[in-house]
UniProtKB/Swiss-Prot annotation:
Free-text cofactor note: Binds a second Mg(2+) ion via substrate during catalysis.
Residues that coordinate or bind Mg(2+): D241, E285, D312
Active site: E204, K337
Keywords: Cytoplasm, Glycolysis, Lyase, Magnesium, Metal-binding, Secreted
Catalytic activity of the protein: (2R)-2-phosphoglycerate = phosphoenolpyruvate + H2O
Family: Belongs to the enolase family.
GO molecular function, one term: magnesium ion binding
Descriptive protein name: Enolase
GO aspect biological process, one term: glycolytic process
Entry annotated with the keyword Metal-binding: yes
Gene: eno
Enzyme class: lyase
Top-level taxon: Bacteria
E.C. number: 4.2.1.11
Organism: Wolinella succinogenes (strain ATCC 29543 / DSM 1740 / CCUG 13145 / JCM 31913 / LMG 7466 / NCTC 11488 / FDC 602W) (Vibrio succinogenes)
């Protein structure tokens, strides 16, 4: 019987220069695999706990304690077990922690080990990770949601909305959709440069210009799509991640600092309606605060039949919270971030719940990333159909796209949903 022979973690760096956990699992057959855990900038209140040291190192952001938890507590419990029973491994990790949000060992410790176990098992069987996790039905290449203009907490500018994205829908396969997206990105850079805007980039590779309103990025992106020779709304559509929990005040009002105005939930929904009427927007993420469930109900009633309404901070990849949303008719899609919940198995449980209830799933990176491409395989394994992993810049974002290109070339038969998504 093949068993887990060793587990070790070390502190490495993420794309923002902050420490994170790298876990390595070695099996008795000599196979070994590692995983690096991502970290978010705008985080939901109910996310699993990311354990930080809080001392003088790295401005308190060190993860030596999380690594120590891997090297002692998790290692002692998991060595000798089969790597091929992912659900059992993950259940043991949860039981060892003893809390619902990994407050003891840290979700960064838990997820690092969980991902590394899955990788080592796939490597031992000599099959790709997407095939190991998804089986024979893992055939769908995701439509990318490329963040090409950054605002909010992802950039140092005057734009309130966090992400302005393009979705290449009118293409037959993933590689063609990525090519078109890269062309739009380059045209966008030229437009910004010609207009004397700065072309510095944010955490996820998108540009971060100082623009006057939250509508102006949409207008500039449409120009870039047209300059690249594509039809807005037909071949390339738009998507927004508003991240509104970042600018809601204690009174439950939404303060758009860049525009100098404050809106109620209903007024903000009305603003979205006006944008959807004017521009080819097909998806809005975190349109209202994670605590504004009444507002979300109103948002879903008004716009749920027109666009994809994605819950990120709202659901935090948590099956229990998602079930509440399903029961109340809130949103129609969920963002999937494994580090919000803590293990591979819990992530899969949430995706399956969403899919059973006809909620779309969007696999997602975090703003603090690394060269680890686990989510690319995970998106294909779970047939999520959509993925968010930044722009066509910054190597930690490109790593995921390059992995998806490799997967597409490996598959004799694959599917790219494109326009059929909407």
């Amino acid at each position: 019987m093949i068993y887990i022979d060793n587990i070790v973690a070390q502190e490495v760096m993420d794309s923002r220069g902050n420490p994170t956990v790298k876990a390595t699992v070695t099996l008795s057959d000599g196979n070994s695999a590692s995983a690096i855990v991502p970290s978010g900038a705008s985080t939901g209140k109910r996310e699993a706990l990311e354990l930080r040291d809080g001392d003088s190192r790295y401005l308190g952001k060190g993860v030596l304690q999380a690594c120590e938890n891997v090297n002692t507590k998790l290692s002692e419990e998991l060595i000798g077990l089969s790597p091929f029973d992912q659900s059992e491994i993950d259940a043991i990790i949860q039981e060892l922690d003893g809390t619902e949000n990994f407050a003891n060992i840290g979700a960064n410790a838990a997820l690092g080990v969980s991902m590394a176990v899955a990788r080592s098992a796939a490597k031992s069987l000599n099959i790709p990770l997407y095939r190991y996790l998804g089986g024979a039905n893992a055939l769908t290449l995701p439509v990318p949601m490329l963040n090409i203009i950054n605002g909010g907490s992802h950039a140092d500018n005057t734009v309130d909305f966090q992400e302005y994205m393009i979705m290449p829908l009118g293409f037959e396969n993933f590689s063609e959709s990525l090519r078109a997206s890269a062309e739009v990105y380059h045209h966008l850079k030229k437009i910004l440069k010609d207009s004397k805007h700065i072309t510095s980039i944010g955490d996820e590779g998108g540009f971060a210009p100082n623009l006057k309103t939250n509508e102006e990025p949409i207008q500039i992106i449409i120009q870039a799509i047209e300059k690249a020779g594509y039809r807005p709304g037909e071949e390339i559509a738009l998507a927004l991640d508003v991240a509104s929990s970042e600018f809601v005040n204690e009174q439950g009002l939404y303060h758009l600092e860049g525009e100098g105005r404050t809106l109620s939930s209903e007024e903000l929904v009305g603003y979205y309606e006006s944008l959807i009427a004017k521009y080819p927007i097909v998806s809005i993420e975190d349109g209202l605060s994670e605590d504004d469930w009444k507002g979300w109900k109103y948002l879903t009633e008004r716009l749920g039949g027109k666009v994809q309404l994605v819950g990120d901070d709202l659901f935090v990849t948590n099956a229990k919270i998602l079930q509440e949303g399903i029961s109340q008719g809130i949103a129609n899609a969920i963002l999937i971030k494994p580090n919000q919940i803590g293990t591979v198995s819990q992530t899969m449980q949430t995706v399956r719940l969403a899919q059973r209830n006809h909620y779309r799933c969007v696999m997602s990176h975090r703003s603090g990333e690394s060269e680890d491409s686990f989510i690319a395989d995970f998106a294909v394994a779970l047939n999520t159909g959509e993925i968010k992993t930044g722009s066509t810049a910054r190597s930690e974002r490109i790593a995921k796209y390059n992995r998806l290109l490799a997967i597409e070339s490996e598959l004799c038969r694959s599917e790219y949903l494109g326009r059929s998504l909407f």
